[in-house]
């Protein structure tokens, strides 16, 4: 749960069974799960200790991509290759902007977003991306 993108195989089963052991989910489970799936669903999973199958995990937002059983590692590697092809500063700005403004008023989030766009133009990342698009070539990000 402590990552930006989550890939699971179709046979995956996920859960936080700690209550069945007299514990609570540690390692941030009580904080991350509600943020991913909502308070009610998170409490259902944590209070019962039940497992969620892959289809339900995708439906409720616990995972972002569902792939055939046995291919999750390969799919995650392919996703990593896709991520490596993009601008790292732009990706950091996306995550930073989403995290900073997620529960803020829309106007505040839009202002913060505009600041991040301006910073990317100042760094040159955005200009290289636009030039590459116009030149019909792959961008060469630093």
Predicted feature locations:
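CoA-thioester-processing core
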Residues: 1-47, 59-60, 75-79
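Conserved functional loop/turn residues at catalytic and ligand-binding sites
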Residues: 4, 23, 50, 61-62, ...
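C-terminal long alpha-helix characteristic of the crotonase
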Residues: 7-12, 54, 63-111, 115-124, ...
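Hydrophobic alpha-helical segments typical of transmembrane helices
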Residues: 29-32, 41, 90-93, 113-116, ...
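Terminal peptide-recognition signature
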Residues: 33, 57, 94, 133
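Acidic, divalent-metal-coordinating active-site segment for phosphoryl/phosphodiester hydrolysis
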Residues: 49-56
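Terminal low-complexity tails and localization/encapsulation signals of metabolic enzymes
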Residues: 131-142
């Amino acid at each position: 749960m402590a990552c930006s993108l989550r890939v699971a195989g179709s046979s995956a089963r996920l859960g936080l069974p700690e209550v069945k052991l007299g514990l609570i989910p540690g390692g941030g489970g009580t904080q991350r799960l509600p943020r991913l799936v909502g308070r009610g669903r998170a409490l259902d999973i944590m209070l019962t200790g039940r497992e969620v199958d892959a289809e339900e995990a995708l439906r409720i937002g616990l995972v972002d991509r569902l792939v055939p059983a046995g291919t999750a590692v390969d799919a995650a590697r392919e996703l990593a290759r896709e991520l490596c092809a993009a601008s790292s500063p732009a990706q950091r700005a996306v995550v930073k902007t989403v995290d900073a403004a997620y529960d803020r008023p829309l106007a505040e989030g839009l202002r913060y977003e505009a600041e991040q766009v301006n910073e990317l133009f100042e760094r040159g990342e955005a200009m290289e991306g636009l030039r590459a698009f116009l030149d019909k070539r792959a961008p060469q990000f630093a």
